[in-house]
Amino acid sequence: MQEQMSRRDLLKLGVAGAGALALGAVNAQASALNAKDVKFDEEWDVIIIGSGFSGLAAGLKAAQKGNKVLILEKMGRIGGNSVINGGGMAVANNPVQAKTNIKDSKELFIADCLKAGLGINHTELLETLVDRGMDAYNFLVENGVQFKEHCAHFGGHTVARSLLTTNDSGSGYIQPMLEKFEALKDKGCELRRRAKFDDFVLDESGRVVGVTIREEYRFDDKLYSDDLENTSGTKKTLKANKGVVLAAGGFCRDKIFRKLQDPRIPDDVDSTNHPGATAGALLKAFEIGAYPVQVDWIQFGPWASPDEKGFGTAPILTQQGTFKYGIAVDIRTGKRFMNELADRKTRADAEFKILREKPGAYPITFADTKMAFKDLSEEVVQKGMASGKLVGECATLDDIAKKYGVPADALKETVKKYNEGVKAKKDEFGKQESALSEINEAGPFYVIRLSPKPHHTMGGLKINTKAEVISSKTNKPIPGLYAAGEITGGTHGASRLGTVAITDCIVFGMIAGENI
């Protein structure tokens, strides 16, 4: 792996950016500010960096204890990645499973996560996530989140255990939690947009007692590295009497840091993440001694499409649609090449193999129109169909073959063989029996092209089961510093199962708010 940035990368940064990078290397030795050397502009009990699932959960829990809570969001809109995902949350033994006679267990959920994570999960964190899943569910319902009356069966899960918001979106969590938090304004709580975290303030014992920020900050996605080059905003220093919670998310949009972890990711690759998903807050925690955990494991979403930007709607239309009620096919051969409901890494690797062998030969996934999107809200389906580019509508299998350059006879034989496996209740690629349903060979069909995109950074800060960040200097918690969500590492191991991120974020956000 290339340890230093290339000359080309430095040229992209420009003179100012390269200077900032050099300055950053010097400043890394200096770490954070000392409380005795600063004058605080404001005083709070708890300061939270990030306004997504983890940040709002931590804020609501901390506020329940009577704390004055400030949530800081660097972007102009709240929620980060949390508002643009599919809204699925995996909880074992949830009420919807009970109503629909789905048998599940803590042990089965953990086993599924360990299999996807290649066994390198930090099991104490994973067990906490599973054990407190129902607490998270109840917390969300109490705060106004509305769920559908059925569970979805996502890839890598042995059974259907994923709860879904009624609008098939993470915004179904964020909006009601935000309303609850903003209603606490008269109790001294506030959420501030365009407020970027810059650094920590420590006292002489090493305790985190505050942060430096910039208000009226304007994120600039035209910069090669916003963290290094953007100097916008007015500086302030804020005191946090009880501590700071890092809930700043992952770094899938950070061109520099993600390339250091995986040099195969080109600068121009699209990502499912929002533009502000960078490593700035994570690196500041490393500077004050936080342990890094499994930072080089970056997950690609195998359900994304090259025919739309960012997260889009393909992940929802495929995961809850064509992957479940249809199949995925290699356009070169007309044959299936993977279990459509395997874990994310398995599927992404299978798709990358095809694209390495023939760049541009995007695999397709399809199902008949009667079944394809039947579990999805009309709003999501209409959004997916609106562009006219994402979802192909084909009357017959011959039409699919002609439109996407697939061998027609092989395609027909593939569908026939799949249906025979459905009838025999045995799929050649191991698709779970409960997820098998016949494809109407007569059509018509909905078709989506596939191309994996960077989606979730598996690693991050080492935390314990109290959401305390662990120091590499002492192997003990850094006093006053907590973290939750994608900025942490270890829980998911090498690859996260779909819909476990929301559970992770809510559970450890709650825990941080309870313990701070």
Language model regions located:
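Glycine-rich FAD pyrophosphate-binding loop
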Residues: K65-S82
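An anion/pyrophosphate-binding glycine-rich loop and adjacent beta-alpha core
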Residues: L282-K284, Y291-V406
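Glycine-rich loop(s) and the adjacent beta-strand/alpha-helix scaffold that form part
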Residues: F219-E308, F508-I511
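A glycine-rich dinucleotide-binding beta-alpha-beta segment and adjacent secondary-structure elements
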Residues: A410-S495
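Beta1/beta-strand and adjacent pyrophosphate-binding region of the FAD-binding site
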Residues: F40-G52
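N-terminal secretory signal peptides and thylakoid transit peptides that target proteins
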Residues: M1-A18
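Conserved N-terminal glycine-rich FAD pyrophosphate-binding loop of Rossmann-like flavoproteins
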Residues: R77-K99
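Conserved redox-cofactor binding core of oxidoreductases
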Residues: D131-K235, K255-F257, S305-P306, V422-A442
